[in-house]
């Protein structure tokens, strides 16, 4: 009887530990998240399954309240509210699909995993355990994803100890042979530490400073230089002409974040600039829900939010390379990367502007997610972040 009383507490505490450690921003700790389905399956009631799901997700996304408070220069309450709301889809899906029947449980968990990987539930599908596939099975590609998914199903059965041992073996093998993600030849990502001024300070001098940074990095065979999300601020013909003129006489191609505005809202974009001109290269598929993407705006007659281009432009072309672009929030959810991988890109370019995440592990988690997917599909990775 005492054991029955303690089990819900122990499972909930364990799920919090798993969420905290697995999503701490260290690539080799990602497989810890695979313990979540074990804990979920050990719940004896739907209520306990809900507590386990909430504990895991809230721990994994623990940096959100502080980040939102920094972004809006407000107290913690708005962030706490968003944190709880964001956990809703994860908790609801895993609570509704939980079952006592052991024969149905693997298929119920598979359905939950799929729902949290694709829209609409996948819009807040952070902390997905399947991301660990890149750590366990580097270079396996789609077969690694299949193996991880099958293993996740096995972890909710009576065979879970054997599956866990197998996963641990692959984990140790991967850790022993771990190497940093390779940077593609002729590409260079630039990390900046310009805080909240990046994209907001749109002075000519700021652009000249960025141009100088680009030219400094474009050496030793580097021809493609990547700048962080929002680095150029608003995308205008004036700034385009400034950059194109500055790049005359060079072979440099710049890929940078910017905002393209029109009468109906704006797109969070990547633009490409060279001596031949500039153009919008990529429009973000999934902006940050709430702060950027505000679907209720159309119902209220407002049009100041970022547009979501859900399944558009999964791969773009830069020179002779096919690129899978990921901007900020897209690195935290599953489907943008997997959609891009269907088109067999040559490399992944992941950018972000995480000044507002100071003191949290959000940027580290974004980087780790990008690294994990690049490892799984054996793709070169270019990272560029502002903090």
Swiss-Prot record:
Source species: Sinorhizobium fredii (strain NBRC 101917 / NGR234)
The function of this protein is: Enhances conjugal transfer of the plasmid.
Where is the protein localized? Cell membrane
**Family of the protein in this entry:** To A.tumefaciens Ti plasmid TraB.
Under PROSITE patterns, the record lists: CN_HYDROLASE
CN hydrolase domain residues are 187-387
> Which GO cellular component term is one of those annotated?
plasma membrane
> Where is this protein primarily located?
membrane
Annotated membrane-spanning segments are: 16-36, 51-71, 76-96, 110-130, 135-155, 159-179, 252-272, 332-352
Bilayer topology: Multi-pass membrane protein
Q: What is this protein called?
A: Probable conjugal transfer protein TraB
User: What are the alphabetically sorted keywords of the record?
Assistant: Cell membrane, Conjugation, Membrane, Plasmid, Transmembrane, Transmembrane helix
């Amino acid at each position: 009887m005492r054991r029955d009383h303690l089990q819900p507490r122990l499972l909930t505490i364990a799920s919090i530990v798993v969420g905290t450690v697995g999503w701490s921003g260290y690539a080799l700790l990602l497989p810890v998240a695979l313990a979540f389905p074990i804990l979920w399956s050990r719940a004896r009631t739907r209520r306990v399954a809900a507590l386990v799901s909430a504990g895991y997700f809230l721990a994994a996304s623990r940096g959100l309240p502080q980040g939102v408070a920094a972004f809006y220069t407000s107290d913690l309450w708005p962030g706490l509210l968003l944190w709880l709301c964001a956990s809703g889809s994860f908790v609801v899906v895993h609570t509704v699909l939980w079952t006592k029947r052991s024969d149905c449980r693997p298929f119920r968990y598979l359905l939950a995993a799929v729902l949290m990987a694709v829209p609409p539930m996948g819009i807040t599908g952070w902390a997905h355990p399947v991301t660990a596939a890149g750590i366990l099975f580097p270079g396996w590609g789609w077969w690694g994803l299949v193996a991880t998914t099958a293993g996740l199903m096995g972890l909710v059965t009576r065979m879970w100890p054997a599956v866990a041992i197998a996963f641990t073996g692959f984990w140790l093998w991967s850790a022993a042979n771990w190497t940093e993600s390779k940077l593609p030849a002729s590409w260079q990502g630039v990390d900046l530490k310009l805080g909240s001024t990046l994209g907001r300070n749109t002075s000519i001098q700021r652009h000249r400073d960025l141009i100088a940074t680009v030219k400094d990095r474009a050496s030793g065979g580097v021809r493609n230089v990547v700048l962080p999300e929002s680095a150029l601020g608003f995308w205008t013909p004036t700034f385009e002409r400034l950059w194109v003129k500055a790049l005359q006489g060079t072979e440099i191609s710049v890929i940078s974040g910017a905002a393209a505005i029109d009468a109906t809202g704006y797109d969070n974009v990547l633009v490409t600039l060279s001596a031949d001109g500039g153009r919008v290269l990529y429009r973000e598929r999934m902006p940050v829900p709430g702060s950027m993407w505000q679907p209720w705006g159309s119902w209220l007659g407002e049009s100041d939010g970022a547009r979501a281009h859900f399944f558009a432009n999964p791969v773009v072309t830069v020179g002779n390379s096919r690129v899978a672009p990921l901007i900020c929030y897209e690195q935290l959810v599953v489907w943008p990367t997997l959609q891009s991988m269907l088109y067999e890109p040559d490399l992944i370019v992941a950018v972000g502007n995480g000044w507002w995440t100071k003191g949290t592990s959000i940027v580290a988690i974004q980087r780790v997610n990008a690294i994990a997917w690049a490892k799984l599909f054996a793709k070169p990775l270019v990272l560029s972040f502002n903090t």
